Amino acid sequence: MTNSISGDQPTVTTFTSSTTSASGASGSLGASSVSTTANATVTQTANATNSAATSSIQTTGETVVNYTNSASAPTVTVSTSSSSTQATATSNKTSQAVAGKITSPDTSESSETSSTSSSDHIPSDYEPISTTENIYENIYESIDDSSTSGPENTSGGAAALNSLRGSSYSNYDDAAADYEPISTTENIYESIDDSSTSDPENTSGGAAALNSLRGSSYSNYDDAAADYEPISTTENIYENIYESIDDSSTSGPENTSGGAAALNSLRGSSYSNYDDAAADYEPISTTENIYESIDDSSTSDPENTSGGAAAALNSLRGSSYSNYDDAAADYEPISTTENIYESIDDSSTSDPENTSGGAAALNSLRGSSYSNYDDAAADYEPISTTENIYENIYESIDGSSTSDPENTSGGAAAALNSLRGSSYTTGPRNEGVFGPGPEGLPDMSLPSYDPTNKTSLLTFLSNPHVKSKMLENSGHFVFIDTDRSSFILVPNGNWDQVCSIKVQNGKTKEDLDIKDLENMCAKFCTGFNKFSGDWDSRVEPMMSAKAGVASGGNLPNTVIINNKFKTCVAYGPWNSREASSGYTPSAWRRGHQVNFGEIFEKANDFNKINWGTQAGPSSEDDGISFSNETPGAGPAAAPSPTPSSIPVINVNVNVGGTNVNIRDTNVNTTNTTPTTQSTDASTDTSDIDNINTNNQTDDINTTDKDSDGAGGVNGDISETESSSGDDSGSVSSSESDKNASVGNDGPAMKDILSAVRKHLDVVYPGDNGGSTEGPLQANQTLGDIVQDMETTGTSQETVVSPWKGSTSSTGSAGGSGSVQTLLPSPPPTPSTTTLRTGTGATTTSLMMGGPIKADIITTGGGGRIPGGGTLEKLLPRIRAHLDISFDGQGDLVSTEEPQLGSIVNKFRKETGSGGIVASVESAPGKPGSAQVLTGTGGDKGNLFQAAAAVTQALGNVAGKVNLAIQGQKLSSLVNDDGKGSVGRDLFQAATQTTQALSSLIDTVG
């Protein structure tokens, strides 16, 4: 058999005889020995430009392949002898088959072990190998029951050649280390004829098995690079392999008998049709992918065969190839077999890409559809091609035509999955590309709405897609609903007046098209304000009067715009009676023309709405609320602004008593300005037990925010201005709310103030804030009031004690400046002066009967303040101010000047002291002597009457003295010589008399 190839290579005549010995481990073919001796002569002729030179290479060798069922490591022995001679321009290949051995003249001599002149495109991986890169470029496999002279022709019931990357290829693990130094000698197709076989290396029937170069047990070998480094002649073995498969036995693998089909060599006759430039295939080693052909019947396993004339071509790496790791890194430099044409048909064809008959053509990777791809070398350099063989694999299935390479029809069809699986081409890569969601178009559908429901309209218009379609015309917002022939109107941007307006042909009652709808909507918006004004001012009152209904709020339900006569007629609302049958139309139903303005000349244009500056429809959840979720954390709540802010009263509880500080409050503003820094809303009353409830004035200490010291009235006070007056107590401040509770469950502050207000009204009677008639002794003090309100929420009613009077007097101008108040007293108090703010301060209440000395506050120069400067002058001023500023319920009613703080500051300036300071000395009082008065029977009644009269007289005297002190009229009671004897004697006499009467009453009673 002669085969000539025209190409760019020189003419080569090759005589090859090789012997290969190998032993394989168990699990390959079993214990067997195969000896194959081949001697072949191949003549190839090529015409080069301006050259007719030819060359002949004769190689003679003998190869013996021995297979043993051994578990030891395999060994390979290759003996080759070759010679090279120069031949004439034309040489013939002669071969003779003698009992399975081909003999030819032995003209070989020692020569090179590789024919490097046969190829110009050797990849860097295979420097010593010259022809391995182009071995699998074009494999035409013909399987038939009859002879064929062309490898592209087929006859009989066609066979399906599997694609390069067969369906079982994905099962392989083809690690890079395994095959980088291996030069494509691993894989040969094995043909099995006439009967089914589960083992592609075994044969049954009359078939002959072509063992591969490395034998059928190749998977048992260690495929390391070191194994094949010394092998130099394996690259030229596959140049021309003819495999014959027929219905009868054959002793020579190159010979065929019967109706056998010839398999052209890897570099078949049609190879010259391709541009096989070296640059195309530099990085291609092309050994990894061969498809398997199965004829005559369906098979789900490409390695198995069934049918009479079927032949199974195993893949290059055999059926056991699935044992290998087929990592992508293996084939980085491999672009693998871009040109494999597989022809399957019932008739001859001169073009491997074309098919005729009832068969389907498997296009090669570089097949007819490959022209759609840009096949530049740069395209596929980074492609490792073990996973992607250009995504165009056509699978041919015989028996009938098929338009879908993955589908099968007919009796003998078999579906070969593509490299990327049969499911890869079942649908688009992004099946949801046209649906809502990721990778697709957004959902632009509009919600529905109820045109008769205002809330539904507002909800509809608040949708972002709807807002993007809204327009503005003449200050009105509109949404044109072309589906309903209507528009939603927001007059003048007032969302509370939103309404839906239906627009129809007035005669036919049909909906308008889009153009007419937009035109009429523009006219309506342009004349809406003028129409509304004319309706409200003229038409509606007139029509309401005619209809006998109340005017106002009656909107028209229909407006007809006549484009022909350029008029507008409005029809008012029809009530149920007017809408009933047989009712004479009223004024509403007759309609009246209204002025719409110049809408027929030129309607205003629609404009887009800038929602960045224009407010959208309001909803119930408008506004953002910030709530502190951590109790006790975050900034304190600011006081709520109110024009009726009340003064802040801080209750300072000390060991010695309770200070009620009325802080300065600017009532002209709406925000309370407290002067304390405390945020403790509770009041500590644990140290309030020592408060004497017999005096209400000694517990009041009035300061302002500028005062550093604490002052008191008729009590123990501090003479140091720097003391804060809070050594042991806590300060309570109501900063956040005028009605804040004192303590957790205490009463509101205004309730406490109301109780204080009632108490002050009693102890400071008379006009002008009680400046001339108080304070009077009562049954409880101001501290008692506050304490009761804090603890129980209620307080006792304040009642003045007629026999107790808080009397004091200033001394004469030139005297010692002291006034003694002589009243009945319990045991005298120690003659020590205690600081009001000291930790051991005692009660500040006045002790009954003890001599009291109140120093007159003088100016810095030592002179006496004209008109007096005692602390008692301040309280009436505060009392008068409170009467003006607060009503009987304790609510602030006046914010007129002066303020409370300014009153205190003015008093401080008048006294000339840095603070309100007064000292009180307590001395042991002289115990009064009582004499028992005796009388005869019947005098007891007179005695009681006399005692009552004396007591009343003394009360009058005490009241007059008190009035004199308050009115600064002491000069009429004491002498100016400084002795003050008159006043002192009077009080001493009153004291003695009172004591005597008390003893008498006790004795008599």
From Swiss-Prot:
Ranges annotated as biased composition (Polar residues): 1-10, 191-205, 343-357
GO molecular function: PTB domain binding; SH2 domain binding
Major localization class: secreted
Family according to the record: Belongs to the chlamydial CPn_0572/CT_456/TC_0741 family.
Organism field: Chlamydia trachomatis serovar L2 (strain ATCC VR-902B / DSM 19102 / 434/Bu)
Biased composition, class Low complexity, residue ranges: 11-36, 74-121, 661-700, 715-734, 831-846
Region (Disordered): 1-36, 74-128, 191-214, 343-365, 611-645, 661-748, 792-847
One record GO biological process: negative regulation of apoptotic process
Keywords, ordered alphabetically: Phosphoprotein, Secreted, Virulence
Subcellular compartments: Secreted
Domain of life according to the entry: Bacteria
Modification comment: Phosphorylated on a tyrosine on attachment to the host cell. Tyrosine phosphorylation is temporally and spatially associated with recruitment of actin to the site of chlamydial entry. Phosphorylated Tarp seems to remain cytoplasmically exposed on the inclusion membrane at one side of internalized elementary bodies for several hours after entry.
Gene name, Swiss-Prot/TrEMBL: tarP
GO cellular component: extracellular region
Job of this protein: Appears to initiate or participate in signaling events that regulate the actin recruitment, which ultimately leads to internalization.
Protein name in the entry: Translocated actin-recruiting phosphoprotein
Note, other: Transcribed from mid to late cycle in the chlamydial developmental cycle.
InterPro entries linked to this entry: Chlamydial_TARP, DUF1547
